[in-house]
Structures are given as C-alpha cells and as structure tokens.
Amino acid sequence: MSHTIRDKQKLKARTSKIQGQVIALKKMLDEPHECAAVLQQIAAIRGAVNGLMREVIKGHLTEHIVHQGDEARREEDLDVILKVLDSYIK
C-alpha cells in the first residue's frame, strides 16, 4: 500500500488547512489589511505547504528507499525524490 494512501486522512487534513489559509488570504486581499498581516498569512501558507511536503517526503524515503530491498529500484526511487527536491527548492 502506498504511503500516501495509508496516510490519506492526515495528508487531506493538511491540504484542507492550506486551502483554508489560501481562502483567508484571498479575503484579506479583497479588504484593506496591513501589509504585515498579508505577509504573515503568506508565511503561514508557506509553512503549511512545507509541512505537507516534509510528511510526503518522509513517507517516500521510508517506503521507497529505506525499506526497498531491490538496489536498482532504490536508486531509481532516490533519483525521483532528488529531482522533486531540486524542483521544489528552486
């Protein structure tokens, strides 16, 4: 079973939190708000997205790297995660 399926409820809860934060940001932009409050909301969204990414990466590393018995498959999975990290960190 894929770790994203096994952890589906936890991951969906995180995405719901992110969705709520984005909706709140959109409302803030429709009304007059201090720039600091808008920046704080953006930082909160970024933190929530980073937390989601961290959880999925941890699951991937555990499931597909640490517990992968096939060395060739482990190298393929590692290459995938490194490419994802490169694109995420850009």
From Swiss-Prot:
Name used for this protein in its record: Transcriptional repressor RcnR
GO terms, biological process: negative regulation of DNA-templated transcription
Gene3D superfamilies noted in UniProt: Metal-sensitive repressor, helix protomer
The entry's keywords: Cytoplasm, DNA-binding, Repressor, Transcription, Transcription regulation
Family per similarity comment: Belongs to the FrmR/RcnR family.
GO MF annotations in UniProt: DNA binding; metal ion binding
Subcellular location(s) of the protein: Cytoplasm
Annotated InterPro entries: Metal_Tscrpt_repr, Metal_Tscrpt_repr_sf
Main location: cytoplasm
Record GO cellular component, one term: cytoplasm
Protein's job: Repressor of rcnA expression. Acts by binding specifically to the rcnA promoter in the absence of nickel and cobalt. In the presence of one of these metals, it has a weaker affinity for rcnA promoter.
Gene, per the UniProt record: rcnR
